[in-house]
Amino acid sequence: YTTLFRSNGGKEHYMKRVGFLTSGGDCQSLNATMRGVAKTLYENVEDVEIIGILDGYKGLIYGNYKKLSPRDFSGILTEGGTIIGTSRQPFKLMREPDENGMDKVKAMKNNYTKWKLDCLVILGGNGTHKTANLLREEGLNVVTLPKTIDNDLFGTDMTFGFQSAVNIATAAIDNIHTTAASHGRVFIVEVMGHSVGWLTLHAGIAGGADIVLIPEIPYDTDKVVDAINKRTEQGKKFSILAVAEGAISKQDAELSKKDLKKKMKMHPSISYMLGAEIAEKTGQEIRITVPGHTQRGGIPCPYDRVISTRLGAEAAKLIIEEKYGYMVGIKNNEIVPVPLKDVAGKIKAVDPKSSIIKEAKAIGICFGD
């Protein structure tokens, strides 16, 4: 239907009113993705109005939005964050009333109707997609886009924001090399990723980390220590560990949630706990570096800008064709619609038996298993 696929280059002659919503943790390329949707709609629909629902689902619940114009999407391709704000609204609380007893799901449906929306375009990660699917089940027209630096959304090979975060985490590891070598220290670089290790795995390989610890492969502390001692025996004065914030030892994986929480309270994070254990067993000097939220910030890398533009254009095509209830994903470098019901509630984790793990081990990276 769009001019991209029509020989006459004409526009569709009907009104579309679309609401944009960004939810969950921010990341690079949110703005670039919204721009891709908006520019395609403006280019191919005669009469389109876009509103920005402010601060994620909170705006949809409490009725906060602003009208957006083509000018609002100018110059944001390289801008990090989100021009309409975001917030975290846990899915498990969505069906519970707020502190004033208001039915949140009913409120979202009412505002959708009140604003006379034809469709919601929702950008977010796992929790966001659960709520988006809930809204689909409630009869709202929804198209979603896969946002997360964790790259753990089911149904897509890649999420926007991931590659930009890989670049930042890799740079942190790169910059540690010289100081680690100069002082002969063991450095732990803690990378974001509570449940999955895609970011740590890619940054660890790209940054030349000696040891990579991810949630999907519980580690044996003694094997981590052995890997460090082996490097020392080989005359290598330093070691660098890339550790996911959700990494866990085999011993701790056996603990109850209560006992694990109690143990973790003694340390700021997993890296500090692991660092203390390594220092005790090796006698080496340990330093911890936590890039933290810098991994979410800054300008999106060129790769993210490209896939965001492509994803956005295809999302707009679905809206024009009135094909709702889909996430727009990437499969074998092609942009494809994936039924939202097949995505919500599922996580794409690193397979410990996958080729990338085997290849990393082949070059000598230790995973502590």
Place the predicted regions along the sequence by residue.
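Short, acidic/small-residue loops that bind anionic groups at enzyme active sites
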Residues: 45, 135-159, 214-220
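A glycine- and small-aliphatic-rich helix-loop capping segment at beta-alpha/alpha-beta transitions
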Residues: 35-44, 67-72, 134-144, 160-164, ...
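Accessory alpha-helical/coil subdomains and C-terminal extensions
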Residues: 111, 122-124, 130-134, 162-183, ...
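Short, small-residue-biased leader/transition segments that mark boundaries at the very start
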Residues: 1-4
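A cross-family phosphate/adenosyl-ligand binding-site feature
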Residues: 14-22, 33-118, 123, 127, ...
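Short glycine/serine/threonine-rich phosphate/pyrophosphate-binding segments
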Residues: 26-37, 60-61, 105-106, 117-133, ...
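Short beta-strand elements at the ligand-binding edges of bilobed clamshell
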Residues: 155-166, 299-305
